[in-house]
Amino acid sequence: MRSKIVVLDFGSQYAHLIAKRFRMLGYYSEIALPSSDLSVFENCRGIVFSGGPSSVYDEKVPEFNSQILNLDIPVLGLCYGHYIVQLGYGGKVSKADVGEFGFAELKLNPDVKSPLFEGIDCVQQVWMSHQDGVFSLGEGFEAVGSTKDCPFAATQNLSKKRFSLQFHCEVKDTPCGDKIFENFAKFCKMEKNWDQDTVLQVILDGIKKDAKDKKVLLFLSGGVDSTITFALLNNALGQERVLGLHIDNGFMRKNESKNVSEAYKKFGFNNFIVEDASNVFLDAVKGLTDPQKKRMAIGETFISVRNKVVEKLNLNEDDWLLAQGTLYPDIIESGGTKNSNTIKTHHNRVQGIQNLIEKGLIIEPIKELYKDEVRTIGKKLGLDDSLVMRHPFPGPGLSINVLCNSEKALSEKDEKEFLSAQKELDSIVLDQFCENCSKFIKKSVIPCRSVGVQGDFRTYRFPACLTFRPEGKGFFHIPKNREKLESASSSITNSSKFLNRTVIKLYQNPLLKDEDFHLQRGFCTKDRLDQLREVDNIVLQNLHSSSWYDKIFQHLTIDLPYAASENHASFVLRPVCSEDVMTARFAWFPKELIEKILSEIASLDFVDAVYFDITNKPPATFGWE
């Protein structure tokens, strides 16, 4: 039996990322429930307790088999797992005086030697996402490292083989994270026993096992995940047993369906069809404003269209399975693990899909993988970079980038929170910028809520907006220093209950004043989608021509119903850098590129304002819905 590291999933958005990191380092790892029987730990060399959305003092917390702490196996607790370890040995945990979301500076105690930090410098950047904190250590534990607001950021009890960390070393934004995991595996006396060739073979064998003698119908959005799933299915089963279905749902980018078809044919994929169902999908989201309801309507419509295609092609349902290019983050953010909290419902995790899963009628070959792993698999299959490295484009397409609103004024509850958000923002001191920038800076709140994720919980709050000095013709000063913007953004979201995102205003129609802007009635209609397509295409064309497209993970253009009139809109540029989707940093372009993009967007007569999103994940998700 293969030696393993077991990750106990307390519901963290990053639980499977821990297992993935160990696998990438060459160590086989598995996910298990915290309530697991001790038999699960047979041949286990080490145990990691993940983070989670609960407070240890909530009435409803994940069930935990405390006997696990009696095992003579090394344990590493992360965030919520940090608290479980400390409480298990008599420590005290309560609400932290200051929550930490995003970057923090870890300082190691020079008087304490730790095998976990062997070969790691005494000052490190780490990634935090917590609201609770350890106030006194468990028996036998010593403090290994601290941050400005967290005195027990890293602890150990070597005699018990126990370690606990407040920060998330599983995310790339903790650069020393892989080294910490490598050191933990070394402490566990774990030998390397896993590689990407093994992963590919496991997936192909799994497809053959799950499909049995049936054929497979796959939703093809044209994005990386569905494309590589298509290649995997063709490789495992042969093109004669696989049919790709690309649905033009009316939410595609400019010329997207045409470009997807040409790309597939170029690389030898002939077993796919295109179904134009744009009117059906537009009807499904008509009048909807709630982002969750919109996503669910889109997911259910995919199933409905699939059923009509099956009927039209006379496919015997007893002979066919449905396949999806679902990633593990889709499952996590939809609350699809036992202890996780729903951040947003993905279209491939709505009830209709869940029903098919329960009946064993769906194959999801890459559901245990993250985006960077999927791209590695695609390259191993011989796919071209134009397919493997293109920006993600999920099934719902641009529909989730069109924010919707049914009223021209905020509700009483929203108005109250909006005013509280503005009051909070006014009280936050931003001293990151030079005197010239600080003198002209204006702080405001945009009255359009967006989705975020903080401490493993979904948030739905307002964005803060920073405006620098005007430079004529409606354009505003663009700060050069990305780090100062990031620091200001973190200061705002870490200090606020009502703000989860920060943007800077780059352009405002010079004929308009601030008081001309109001929340407008706006829905996901063809007219708004066409406007968004034009703006989005300008950005993407400029990213390609400047070679910036390949330097970032994804760019989203967001359409806000915040303008001077109903047929106009404001737009947000949202470029991000990420490896695994679970965390991200906003990308920052050269000033010349931003100015070129802005000048082209400003020439469109329906554009009232343009903003740039300077928020990392957490506290914000990639998209606003």
For the regions a protein language model found, what residue spans apply to each?
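Flexible gly/pro-rich beta->alpha loop and the following alpha-helix that scaffold active-site loops
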Residues: 4-7, 12-78, 83-89, 182-193
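Short amphipathic alpha-helix with an adjacent loop that forms part of the alpha/beta core around
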Residues: 36-43, 118, 308-314
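Glycine-rich phosphate/diphosphate-binding loops that line cofactor/substrate pockets in enzymes
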Residues: 1, 40-43, 207-214
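ATP/NTP-dependent adenylation/nucleotidyl-transfer catalytic domains that generate, transfer
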Residues: 188-192, 196-625
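Glycine/threonine-rich flexible loop motifs
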Residues: 53-63, 175, 332-338
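Glycine/serine-rich phosphate-binding loop and adjoining beta1-alpha1 elements at the start
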Residues: 170-198
